[in-house]
């Protein structure tokens, strides 16, 4: 298995307490258990770094920590956002900055855990300075998307921002709409904004960063069994309550793994068994993409197998054995 060492000047090399511990990994890899164990052992606070677990409407289908688990150590940024909100990476960084300040003021160790690579990249590399898109521009683009279709929007993007149009898949509704919104609102292509970044909240040299990398086949089997357990635990009722709100299907919460398939089942389009199969398959594909993304985008994260987790814990906090 490919591994990568953390930066040579990281805090663990100097025997000092890190500014934070970052625990990433694919879905269902055991991140939450590792973070909770570390929080209990080190006096830490667990901070969510997952783009779907921020939504209060989706505790079960996103595998958020249970109330019993949350009672064992302080948790932050879980279930704090309504599903009607398009919660951006910029909004996350702002919320994370406040959470980090609170945790540090209390003298606790921040433990950031999740599978959203963009959030970790924004925290450790800085965030692109894309300004907020006015609501009227966003609404106009989405109206055109619904009325004219994604191909028409892609053609318009090719005229406004040829580089983005060439880079994006012609059927990628969300990213095409986003790129068009930015160029229409600012007069500048998205790539221009991406070249400008804010200072990172958590410079790589100040943190310990780990990526849990379990055996692929074992992970995929765990994903399948966990999705079945979610259904038994009330995921269908949770999604039904979300569907009743009739929110914009392009909102992030409406695209959480399993949600679209279960909504199709609730509409009578597919059976529950088919919905479960689709939801589990989508989650497996996402896990595969997480491996690839972190390997190429954040090589400074140290890759460890879950069974190496205890040894990892002993290296994080100086003096802990």
Swiss-Prot record:
Enzyme Commission number(s) of this protein: 2.5.1.75
UniProt record, GO biological process: tRNA modification
Recorded catalytic activity of this chain's protein: adenosine(37) in tRNA + dimethylallyl diphosphate = N(6)-dimethylallyladenosine(37) in tRNA + diphosphate
Record function comment: Catalyzes the transfer of a dimethylallyl group onto the adenine at position 37 in tRNAs that read codons beginning with uridine, leading to the formation of N6-(dimethylallyl)adenosine (i(6)A).
Cofactor: Mg(2+)
Keywords of this entry: ATP-binding, Magnesium, Nucleotide-binding, Transferase, tRNA processing
HAMAP family: IPP_trans
Stated name of the protein: tRNA dimethylallyltransferase
Assembly notes: Monomer.
Residue positions binding ATP: 25-32
GO molecular function, one term: ATP binding
Residues of the site described as Interaction with substrate tRNA: 116, 138
NCBIfam families: miaA (TIGR00174)
Entry coiled-coil feature ranges: none
PANTHER family: TRNA DIMETHYLALLYLTRANSFERASE
Binding site for substrate: 27-32
């Amino acid at each position: 298995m490919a591994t990568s060492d953390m930066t040579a000047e990281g805090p663990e090399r100097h025997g000092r307490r890190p500014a934070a511990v970052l625990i990433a990994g694919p879905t269902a890899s055991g991140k939450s258990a590792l973070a909770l164990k570390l929080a209990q052992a080190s006096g830490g606070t667990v901070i969510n770094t997952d783009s779907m677990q921020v939504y209060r409407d989706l505790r079960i289908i996103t595998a958020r920590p249970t109330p019993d688990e949350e009672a064992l150590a302080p948790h932050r940024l879980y279930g704090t956002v309504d599903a009607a909100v398009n919660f951006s990476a910029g909004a996350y960084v702002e919320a994370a900055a406040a959470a980090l300040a609170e945790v540090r003021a209390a003298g606790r160790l921040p433990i950031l855990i999740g599978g959203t690579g963009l959030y970790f990249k924004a925290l450790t590399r800085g965030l692109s300075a894309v300004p907020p898109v006015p609501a009227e521009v966003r609404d106009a683009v989405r109206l055109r998307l619904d009325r004219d279709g994604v191909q028409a929007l892609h053609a318009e993007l090719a005229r406004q921002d040829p580089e983005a149009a060439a880079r994006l898949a012609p059927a990628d509704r969300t990213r095409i709409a986003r790129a068009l919104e930015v160029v229409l609102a600012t007069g500048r292509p998205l790539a221009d904004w991406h070249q400008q970044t804010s200072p990172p909240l958590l410079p790589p040299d100040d943190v310990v960063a780990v990526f849990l990398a379990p055996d692929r086949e074992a992970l995929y089997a765990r994903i399948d069994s966990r999705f079945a357990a979610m259904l038994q635990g009330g995921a269908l009722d949770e999604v039904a309550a979300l569907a009743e709100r009739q929110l914009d299907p392009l909102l992030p919460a409406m695209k959480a793994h399993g949600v679209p398939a279960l909504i199709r089942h609730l509409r009578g389009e597919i059976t529950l068994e088919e919905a479960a199969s689709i939801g589990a398959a989508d989650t497996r594909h996402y896990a595969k993409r997480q491996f690839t993304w972190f390997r190429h985008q954040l090589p400074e994260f140290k890759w460890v197998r879950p069974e190496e987790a205890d040894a990892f814990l002993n290296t994080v906090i100086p003096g802990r054995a």
